[in-house]
């Protein structure tokens, strides 16, 4: 009798462990970062590290598809060409990662921003229009292959139309409000503010 009770307790424990494990797995989130590596290549604590500290249930925070000076047009072309990289000797396809992601964070064109955004009004207007069109097109392409939530960290000059369509997080505002140096690399305060804005969209 005692042996039967122990067996019942054992099997119940296994069952509860299995249920808890599956619940935990099903509630884990996959975050994919696309664009240039400007915001995540820094001596400071960057927003992706803040995210890892906060969310214990992150299954994967993938930033392998970020590259130097990446533009939104580059990302569009990479998706169209089913771009892949090698990780641990195996091919990892961008489109597959997009379909597996719950959240996709876009941040690109940073080099163009610093080059164009402090020029004359006509140049700024053209820059804003081009980037607006690229982001709208990129969002449309992503939506066809993934239901993931897309968050855009935008480097844009002040333009109402651009902000209306793509102003998820205005890096320009955060930079001038919290950056206490003229360095292009963002300090801890700006990185924390970016992280805080992302959390609002996640939650």
Question: Predicted segments — roles?
Answer:
Residues 1-12:
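N-terminal Sec-pathway targeting helices
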Residues 7-8, 16, 53, 172-175:
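Compositionally biased amphipathic helical and low-complexity segments enriched in hydrophobic
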Residues 12-13, 34, 185:
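Alpha-helical architecture
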Residues 86-203:
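Alpha-helical cap/lid subdomain in secreted, periplasmic
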Residues 15-29:
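Membrane-interface motif at the C-terminal end of an N-terminal transmembrane signal
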Residues 24-27, 55, 145-146:
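A structural signal for short coil/turn segments at secondary-structure junctions
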Residues 29-33, 38-126:
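Conserved SGNH/GDSL esterase-like catalytic core that processes O-acyl groups on lipids
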